[in-house]
Amino acid sequence: MGNLFDSSKTLWGNMNHGSSRYSLNGKIMLASVIILFVAVILILCFHSYARWLFRRQNRRIRRRISAHLRSLAAARDPTQSSSSLSPLDPTVLEKIPIFVYSVKTHESPLEECSVCLSEFEEDDEGRVLPKCGHVFHVDCIDTWFRSRSSCPLCRAPVQPAQPVTEPEPVAAVFPSVKPIEDTEAGSSSSSDESESSTPSSSSGSPVRFPMEACEREPIDLVGIIVEIPREFQDSNSDLPADNGSNRRASLKRLWII
């Protein structure tokens, strides 16, 4: 009887010892699950914070580059008239499509933006240039186009070239020439003859002008004597008689005036 009681007591003790061991293992498992869950949460929080900090740094870099590009655009020489140095037309810039980057929509990873030198991340907005196909951030390329109108990488023009309009041929209009009347022809011929005879007469003999009568009497010039210097007389003494008559005619004209 005593042996039976001892055996039952031993069995009951073993069962209590096993249940306490199971409870201890359950507590350890629960604690480990809680610790693992907290660790995962901490890792996710740290990853989110690091990603936010990295994107914030990229935004600062973009703003700094944008401010630098604005200063370059403000300090640019206004006398430069090259097409690549002129700012892009806002209407052309609005026609360039904008996309939102996502890993699901873009199977192959995009290249980094050449303006800010940072890679595209989730939900980043970008533009694809139509001619060369290069991809840039919206903020970066919009700031670039405020002072340039070409691609930052290949310098391909973004703005379409304006068609050259050829000037229309202008018909030449000649004024109609009216026939010259006989009187004009006669007067022109007489004037030509007089002009042709003038140099010949001047070269051969002095020109004689006809005496012109003055109707007014020379009242104010009465008693005026014109004296000719002796040197002038000596120098003109060797001239022919025609020159003397011309001199007398000129003196008479002065006297009449």
UniProtKB/Swiss-Prot annotation:
Family: Belongs to the RING-type zinc finger family. ATL subfamily.
Swiss-Prot/TrEMBL GO biological process terms: protein ubiquitination; protein-containing complex assembly
Membrane-spanning ranges: 28-48
Source organism of this protein record: Arabidopsis thaliana (Mouse-ear cress)
Disordered: annotated segments: 181-209
Gene responsible for this protein: ATL5
Catalytic activity reported: S-ubiquitinyl-[E2 ubiquitin-conjugating enzyme]-L-cysteine + [acceptor protein]-L-lysine = [E2 ubiquitin-conjugating enzyme]-L-cysteine + N(6)-ubiquitinyl-[acceptor protein]-L-lysine
Record field: compositional bias (Low complexity): 185-206
Name of the protein: RING-H2 finger protein ATL5
Species classification: Eukaryota, Viridiplantae, Streptophyta, Embryophyta, Tracheophyta
SMART domains for this protein: RING (SM00184)
Enzyme class: transferase
Record-level Gene Ontology MF annotations: transferase activity; zinc ion binding
Entry note about domains: The RING-type zinc finger domain mediates binding to an E2 ubiquitin-conjugating enzyme.
GO cellular component, one term: membrane
EC identifiers of the protein: 2.3.2.27
